[in-house]
Amino acid sequence: MAESKSTSWADEVASPTIEKNEGNPLEEAQLDGATEPLGGGTLQDGQYEVEVKLSDIQGDETSPLYSVETFEQLGIDASILKGLYAMNFKKPSKIQEKALPLLLRNPPTNMIAQSQSGTGKTAAFVITILSRLDFSKPTTPQALCLAPSRELARQIEGVIRSIGQFVDGLTVQAAIPGAVERNAKVNAMVVVGTPGTVMDLIKRRSIDASQMKILCLDEADNMLDQQGLGDQCMRVKSMIRVEQILLFSATFPDEVYGFAQDFSPRANEIKLKRDELTVSGIKQMFMDCPNEVGKYEILVKLYGLMTIGSSIIFVKRRDTASNIAERLTKEGHKVAAVHGAFEGSERDQVLEDFRQGKAKVLITTNVLARGIDVQSVSMVINYDVPMKGRSDSEPDPETYLHRIGRTGRFGRVGVSISFVFDRKSYDALNQIANHYNIDLIKLNQDDWDETEEIVKKVIKSSRAGTNLQS
């Protein structure tokens, strides 16, 4: 972490974190294709290298289809291309250049793909799903996409509908809690859902899984790493026979990667180096709070900066989220909270209100840490440094990366501010910084004019890259 101008116990802690070179904007960005209600914008396509590991040692990396520069080179159906162009896609991002030729080739092959947040992973697997469908069977489920939360499942459903808006006969249905009535059938070609609900629907024969062709897991590391979700994903996989299994995520911890390889055997693999996983458009900062109580006082001081755009505050506990929302509301601030204790319909409404700007600050737990795209989010606050497990025994760098990835998306810049208040939280954040080889800028709580100037300069700056409009 960078040196501080103010004095505190943390100033005495030696930090090995390497100072990063500032002022290196993203090289290019393109529209990601998400419709405006979904928070669409531009893709991150900065200076990083995509590493490809072919499952087939006969694979020819010199083949013209090994990497492409235009969507037309892929032989994608004209109706899908029309949807991409209508959503302002101009050319494949770096991850798409490498992934799509492998995803679309025949016979189908499995893939494990890792890339930064906002680089076009969703569009890559959506294009693949649409390209695998047999449109002579409009009421037969043929593609299944699993996500860890109802919010992400709904978002993926929306992206499929948007990219497939000109595909005649396309049917898509969400399989999330409360979306399918007890005795109803799921008669859609593409099913997007959460593992537990999908498992129950297949067991009840509400989903005919006999003709499934493709299975995709978004945020795959999260689902395979959690015992409950991992077991459910394995059960779902055992209930269907598919030609292609796709695993996508921004992170794949070493302890999960072996499980991913077992789940998606003989897969082509696409991934980034660890120190390339963070997005250069996110300016990562931290504040040394006097104590646990002082975190809230500093949060209140930051409120004016949080509402320049929209902001998400991440906490560990549900009661903390509710308490902060209640206190801020009583002080006259327009905020919203959402966490796992909310009913599904409530969660949907809160997120929709946040997308529409009815509330500019959202307090949440890790339920929204992954995959959720809201274009207006300019700041993320880690009120609690992410830790692993109930005992908080060690820092959780993967969750940190996913949390801050809610801002700085689509080629824009954003700010993340993490709160520390004791040696444990400071050391945890420092370990996360070292894990990704990043530097964290310390904001001076004793000089709010300086702090506001630093943060405002980032939030009000132009996009991190330029649109490829020509």
Curated annotation (Swiss-Prot):
It catalyses: ATP + H2O = ADP + phosphate + H(+). ATP binds at residues 115-122. InterPro entries: DEAD/DEAH_box_helicase_dom, Helicase_ATP-bd, Helicase_C-like, P-loop_NTPase, RNA_helicase_DEAD_Q_motif. Its EC number is 3.6.4.13. It holds the Pfam family DEAD. One of its GO terms (biological process) is tRNA export from nucleus. Associates with the nuclear pore complex. ATP-dependent RNA helicase associated with the nuclear pore complex and essential for mRNA export from the nucleus. May participate in a terminal step of mRNA export through the removal of proteins that accompany mRNA through the nucleopore complex. May also be involved in early transcription. This is ATP-dependent RNA helicase dbp5. It comes from Botryotinia fuckeliana (strain B05.10) (Noble rot fungus). The lineage of its organism: Eukaryota, Fungi, Dikarya, Ascomycota, Pezizomycotina. The gene is dbp5.
